[in-house]
């Protein structure tokens, strides 16, 4: 028996500078804000699910690229201690290695990335993970170094899939 999981709901991206990362994901990558940017006491409000202790403030935003209420969203989080300094993650902590984001048009995507002087890590390259399934992949990094694979799926058209 399976758990009945149907899809990924959201991914958390923890950043060191909220405004810089918010600008990158909205202005450069075209995400839009769901609701509003909010701030809260992470330890008091979400200690169990965020695994934080002590006096830790969190600034957060939910971002999406879709009008579909059931679409996966990005949860952009920035944690700060009582002095307002970012709460660092250690290199020992395993975590998210990269995010894959589907794009409609790789040519337009590459032009936008270049327009905003975002360094390209790799690509675009064409991958064929299985016969008849091609992926054009452009790899960049967000301001904190999280790898992002911007992926075009030509055989699927511009819809979801």
PLM regions and their residue ranges:
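Vicinal oxygen chelate
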Residues: 1-4, 13, 36, 74, ...
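Core segments of cupin and vicinal oxygen chelate
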Residues: 14-70, 108, 115, 131
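Eukaryotic phosphotyrosine signaling hubs
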Residues: 96-98
